[in-house]
Amino acid sequence: MLSVLDIFRVGIGPSSSHTVGPMRIGRRFIGALKKRGLLDQTDRVLVELQGSLALTGKGHATPKAVVLGLLGLQPETLDPATADADVARVAQDGRLKLGGTHDIAFDPEADIVFAYDNIPDLHPNAMEMSAFDADGAILFSRTYFSTGGGFIASRRQLERPAKGDLVHAATDARFPFGSAAELLAHCAAENMAVHELIMANEETHRPRAETEAMLDRIGEVMMACIDRGLRTDGVLPGKLGVKRRAPALWRKLVESPNSNEREQLFDWLNVYAMAVNEE
């Protein structure tokens, strides 16, 4: 079954399936080219977004995620402060370094295609990735699927699932459960709190100290996201020119003489949520 580290993931927003997943797919495609010795022969890459990725991709920053993935960047280690600049540079220069090393011509407007009428039968979030040589011949082409939660899969993985592949995760935990009722039943039988039982399950995957360190890292990223949202003034990305609201509201709360009063707790929660949303 899934680990808490599969559920709580570091990555760019706004969507795990339409942003994190496509970014991982782009990077995985580059890995496939390297594995086959085709990266240096690649002169062009064409990305076709299908199904929901095409229909709602622009609003979920899917093209941005595709570019970042082709650059070889990872959601877990991406610097959000430089991501937009990296994507803008590709659009401006018309060049992209595949995997961060191999330079090709790349125009996001032409080389990322929105196939609105192509609705896949296997899964609604599909990306067809194709690499071409200098003569225009196809070197390698593969369709991947963003299955939700940042998970990705090839067609073969979905058609012939393997045990423990995280798309069809194996039930290998010490206390497996598929519902809240089953979870609470385990807790009652073992006289354990929910967090104790979950940690026992995590210890089937890795040492406790490693899990705790990873969760601490995720918590730090969450707090950093809030902090950036509270301190970054200006206008949100996009053509509407929407002004960021969180910084002004945060300063108003800080300066309020009753900033620690109980009735303002929800105001603080709201401004933190707004800060994350605007990030």
Regions found by a protein language model. Give the residues of each.
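Conserved phosphate/anionic-ligand binding catalytic regions in large, soluble enzymes, centered on
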Residues: F8-G26, G59
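Buried hydrophobic packing segments
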Residues: P22-F29, L70, V276
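Phosphate-handling active-site elements
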Residues: F29-V45, E76-L78
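Beta-sandwich/jelly-roll carbohydrate-recognition scaffolds of carbohydrate-active enzymes
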Residues: L46-L197
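N-terminal amphipathic, basic-rich helices that act as targeting or association modules
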Residues: G178-R228
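Accessory "access/gating" subregions that flank catalytic or transport cores
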Residues: R206-E279
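Short, hydrophobic/aliphatic alpha-helical segments
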Residues: M1-G11, L46-L49, L269-E279
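Conserved catalytic cysteine-centered active-site region
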Residues: M1-G13, Q74-A83
